[in-house]
Amino acid sequence: MKIFIIKIILVLFNYVLLSYSINQDLNILNVYDVRFAQTHVIPIEGKSWILNNKTYTLTIVGNRDSLLLVKFIDISITGTSSIKTVTTKTTKEEIKATILTNTYNVMVWNNDIVMGTRLLNDPNQLPPTESNGEQYSNEHHSIMIPKEWVKPGMKLQFFENSNSFIKSSKFIFPNVGQDYTLKMWTLPFYLFGANDTNTRPFNQTKNIDDSISAGLSQVYSCSNILSLNHPIQRVDWPYLVLGPRNGLPGMLITNSDQKKDGYAIMEGVLNILTGIRVAFGESTSSIQIYAPLLHLGANGKYADTYGGLGGSSRGTGDYRYSDTFVHEQGHAMGLPHAGEAFASGSYPYVNGSLLGSEWGFDINHYEFLSITLSNTSKNYKGCEKKNVKDTQNRCVKQSVMQSGAGDRSSNYLFSMFSDFEMSIIQNYFKNSIYYDEQIGKYKKWNETIGSYYEYKPITKDYGFYRLDDGIPIERDIDVYTIVFTYSLVGPEPLSQIYPLLKSKGNLIRQFDPTNKTEMKLITPNTGSIPWYCFNSGCDYTIRVTYDDDSIKHILLQQGKRQYWKPMGDFKLNFNDPTSSDSFLLGVINVKAIKTIKKVELLETLMAWNGISKNSKLLTFKLF
């Protein structure tokens, strides 16, 4: 009898537990497929890839207006529904999962602070697709979330408003990452007599106009874009010295037709941009620099670049800020050619296409972007002969980094990158040093805690690469930028001091080879910065003479030594005119507190031992 009573009690207890569980479920609003649309429509947890044993992760960018998308499932005992139901069985009840189109709110939190509430739009109000294309979804509710709410620590809770009692979801935690501004300098190069009249006026080349910046902000994964003319403003030079390249010796050219191949001038300009970034203390920053090339051919008329070149935070090409520009700045942020990357196993989508990438979204047009070509695309006609196809035999877009420029719809300035490429761009910004102008301090991003922290620059690797993380010791001061070349084997025209560039710029730490205390710091193996001269030696010095005959010496972190042998043998090919070992390009900034009247390049072998007043003069220029 006791056993029977116990069994009855257990049955009743289990029934109560089940009923309680069901009722508890009924009070929970069930959500799924929650997504954020920025450059791409991605799950709130982000998206990851593992390629060649390396993990790539795309997250939601902080401080960027975003479209929130969500589907709802309502679980009810009654099973009432106006749309299809999915039925499951339990031992006691039949529960129907119903996809509804009720009215819903979302409350956005940041940690324990409520940022605000938004009423979600019904699925029939979802933004359209470019060129009236296939609808992205007919089930997602959506709403724009202001950028101020999109930050690490974000959490979402959804509420159903159609029942007699309020039903709420569990908290959902979007994976929000770094917020950052893509700051971009533009520095037009007017070469070989090019000017505002015979090419393009400076007011059209000095900066990216607002409409183009707005378009760029939708294809690059960033919080916003800040495009500014570089402090140097413009470069006007009648000649350009090209270093040895592709087995050919260096040369001085005075028109674009003298170049030996299509990329020679662009490579020369990129190398100068590298020096400018270093001289301005931006080598470890995420600041981009792009140089529109305006040069004349042998006929004295504008010669198009017909392409571009980019990498390592620099880019150059034509002045139009269009397809070439967006592609080269992709290289500048670390993106390779997508087709080549796929072949090497470092890009996930076949032949550099977008097959497998998430759809895109453009907030300016308020449209979704399909991964397939629209019928308004320039490349739509005949695409079946060259483009990758999806399962419905539709042409799939190519990445911007693999011949995809013409795949965009006709009313768009730029075509699409893949979602994977955005993860590379995000990683590029994570490792950079930022200057906070409001507080006058440097900061870096800490991904673990999801915030910036104050960063104090230090000299790493015993000064092998740079001092003080390459950061300026003085900012926003008047400077002269000195650009020079020197050939160890000649001819003489390859050794040049370019016309000076004056601007409001920055100054990095430098050493004076006439100062014994400073030279003691960089003496190989014994100084406190013992590897400063280990890359190629410290064998050259710039001597600047001002108009009052005062003199300044700046030791260059450049030499003619073999790698890791600052006191050892010269480079193996220093006498070969076709080798880069025989050529020197340098860029430094000096204070413009006085007018410069002469710049000299001196040979000062192993300068930490001190330099002679009669050091060998290699080249000079009077101003």
Curated annotation (Swiss-Prot):
Keywords: Hydrolase, Metal-binding, Metalloprotease, Protease, Secreted, Signal, Zinc. InterPro entries: Dictomallein, MetalloPept_cat_dom_sf, Peptidase_M66_dom. It is an enzyme of class 3 (hydrolase). One of its GO terms (cellular component) is extracellular region. Binds 1 zinc ion per subunit. Its EC number is 3.4.24.-. Gene3D superfamilies: Collagenase (Catalytic Domain). It is found in: Secreted. Its main location: secreted. Its cofactor is Zn(2+). Residues 1-21 form the signal peptide. The keyword Metal-binding applies. GO terms for biological process: proteolysis. Belongs to the dictomallein family. This is Dictomallein-5. It comes from Dictyostelium discoideum (Social amoeba).
